[in-house]
Amino acid sequence: MSFTSKTSKSHAEATVNKLFSSLLPGTQGTTSKQSSSLSSAELLSIEIENKNKLSKEELKKIHKQNKFKQHKKIKKALEDEKRFNKLAKYHLIKHHKTGGELSEEEAKYLKKLVKKNVNSLNRVSEIDDMEIKSELDQVRQDILKINKEKHDKKAKRIQNKKTKDFNSKVAKGMISYPGLTPGLAPVGLDDSDDE
């Protein structure tokens, strides 16, 4: 068989050698001399084949990245579902409150939500826009004022109750003040000392 160029001859030899190396166990593949005479398209094809064969480390890395992305998607979906459930619960409680059907558990939840919102308002960082900052400060003051008034009323009511209980116990004789007995002077003092 005659070849018109060295390139076509090397292509034919490479193809035959490749065929023999895959079929016969004792034959060797292409030598470095022959591989250098391969066309650029064949070299590119071989390079792409080698790139497609990933090492174990690369496979692990890709698997890890895919797992991380999947975990992130699941986490985001759970957060969205949790946020939706909270919002639905809030709207249900708000509806019950306007209807006057608020249960004790729902009232506790509202108190907890108010405390949480007050704390988050107290922790708000600095804001650059003065209009937004002034509006936010006004809202914060209104909420804190309402919360303080409720707290003050409750504290005053508790203190009044404690005072009434104490006075009623003293009047009944259940408890007594420590100190002087009525009509007696303290020990060690004379009647002549009038200071």
UniProtKB/Swiss-Prot annotation:
Pfam families named in the record: RRT14 (PF17075)
Compartments it resides in: Nucleus, Nucleolus
Listed GO CC annotations: nucleolus
Keyword Electron transport attached: no
Keyword entries, A-Z: Nucleus, Transcription, Transcription regulation
UniProt keyword Calcium present: no
Role noted for this protein: Involved in ribosome biogenesis, probably through modulation of rDNA transcription.
Family: Belongs to the RRT14 family.
Protein name per Swiss-Prot or TrEMBL: Regulator of rDNA transcription 14
Protein's organism: Debaryomyces hansenii (strain ATCC 36239 / CBS 767 / BCRC 21394 / JCM 1990 / NBRC 0083 / IGC 2968)
Lineage: Eukaryota, Fungi, Dikarya, Ascomycota, Saccharomycotina
